[in-house]
């Protein structure tokens, strides 16, 4: 394979990698917004739950029953983590990191957008 074909292959790989990472961005943004909203709801519900004087006087489950906003948002947050939201909000970074690991064997790397970074060849003497 000559150097022109190799350059074309590298450009095609870079185009596909940047396209894939770029396509992940909208979904990642939506997952991040969902995580932020549910986290804020859980924090707000927890604050209201903690400052309620009735919380100390009743049992734990009765207290949760009296604060459905906190209970539902907490269950939702736990469900989101079981569904893997912690991986979905950083999916492009995971893809880029895995590509860097593989590309390191070929003296290459990539940035977070998928652009290839060619490193100089080590001189063997």
Curated annotation (Swiss-Prot):
It is a multi-pass membrane protein. This is Nuclear envelope phosphatase-regulatory subunit 1. Keywords: Acetylation, Cytoplasm, Lipid metabolism, Membrane, Nucleus, Transmembrane, Transmembrane helix. Interacts with CTDNEP1; the complex dephosphorylates LPIN1 and LPIN2. The gene is CNEP1R1. Belongs to the CNEP1R1 family. Muscle specific with lower expression in other metabolic tissues. GO terms for molecular function: protein phosphatase regulator activity. PANTHER family: NUCLEAR ENVELOPE PHOSPHATASE-REGULATORY SUBUNIT 1 (PTHR20996:SF1).
């Amino acid at each position: 394979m000559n150097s022109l074909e190799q350059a074309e292959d590298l450009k095609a790989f870079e185009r596909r990698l940047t396209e894939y990472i770029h396509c992940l961005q909208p979904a990642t943004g939506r997952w991040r917004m969902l995580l932020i909203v549910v986290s804020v709801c859980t924090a707000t519900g927890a604050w209201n739950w903690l400052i309620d004087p009735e919380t100390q006087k009743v049992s734990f489950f009765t207290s949760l029953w009296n604060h459905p906003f906190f209970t539902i948002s907490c269950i939702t947050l736990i469900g989101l983590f079981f569904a893997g939201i912690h991986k979905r909000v950083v999916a492009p970074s995971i893809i880029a990191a895995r590509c860097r690991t593989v590309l390191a064997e070929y003296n290459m790397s990539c940035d977070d957008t998928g652009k290839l970074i060619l490193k100089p060849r080590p001189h063997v003497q």
